[in-house]
Amino acid sequence: MSTALEARKAGFATGGATLVHNVDLAVAQGELIAIVGPNGAGKSTLLRMLSGDLRPTSGSVRLGDRELSSYSPRELADRRAVLAQHINVSFPFTVEEIVRMGTGDVGHRKAGALIDAALHEVGLGEFRSRDITTLSGGEQQRAHFARVLVQLWSSEAVRGPGILLLDEPTSSLDIRHQLDLAHTARRCARNGATVIAILHDLNLATRFAERIVVMHRGAVAADGPPSTVMRPELIGAVFDVELTVQMDASGSPFVLPELTRA
């Protein structure tokens, strides 16, 4: 399978601090990856470099057969969709208007069908006329997820499989909608999209992803399938907690933190 996105010795430094250093990461088309790690590990900085929002101060990032920095903003928007960690909308856009912002080079009828499908996918079909500023945090997050789905699907309708980058997409969601989002992302990957998501819930990550990248102090501490990455000695050291890792009935690792820390 071809490489969709690749970081080569990529790093980012600012204000005398190195936030990410020497990251090698090749992601294949259709692959589904979760990035995990403690606060300040460099996860969001790495994702912003992979999206083109930040240009590496060392090394490089490639999208397909070109340097990521060689793409124009329009070209990037046509090839990858990004759900940022923090999205503040102060104006009273309706949910449908927010989702419509994701449509690209598709006709009006096709755009309408994609918007309908995305709103149904995130369970906001009855919210399309609502002012987004009146929604709960979780509802707003689902509306923005619908927007990036429309962007991804619009791109795929014209250029084939794209890239979906998600920065803590479940942070405001209840457990049902966390699982719904994970299932949607998996379907996107099965349809050929490349999906990379930052997740804080380690157990959701082990079920969600076929590959986990563990970040620690700006570097990749581990990279591989959940069964090999989720080792108690590694995860405990990275997060500075005592924990055990068991296998659930499906054979997936399940992380159990100890609650008796002194």
Swiss-Prot record:
Ranges for domain ABC transporter: 5-242
Entry keyword set: ATP-binding, Cell inner membrane, Cell membrane, Membrane, Nucleotide-binding, Translocase, Transport
Primary location: membrane
Places the protein is found: Cell inner membrane
Top-level taxon of origin: Bacteria
EC number(s) from the headed UniProt entry: 7.6.2.-
EC category: translocase
Pfam families linked to this entry: ABC_tran (PF00005)
GO CC, one annotated term: plasma membrane
Residues that, per the record, bind ATP: G37, P38, N39, G40, A41, G42, K43, S44
Disulfide bonds: none
GO-annotated molecular function: ATP binding; ATP hydrolysis activity
Topological category with respect to the lipid bilayer: Peripheral membrane protein
Function: Part of the ABC transporter complex HmuTUV involved in hemin import. Responsible for energy coupling to the transport system.
Subunit organization: The complex is composed of two ATP-binding proteins (HmuV), two transmembrane proteins (HmuU) and a solute-binding protein (HmuT).
Family the entry assigns: Belongs to the ABC transporter superfamily. Heme (hemin) importer (TC 3.A.1.14.5) family.
Protein name: Hemin import ATP-binding protein HmuV
Taxonomic placement: Bacteria, Pseudomonadati, Pseudomonadota, Alphaproteobacteria, Hyphomicrobiales
Gene expressing this chain: hmuV
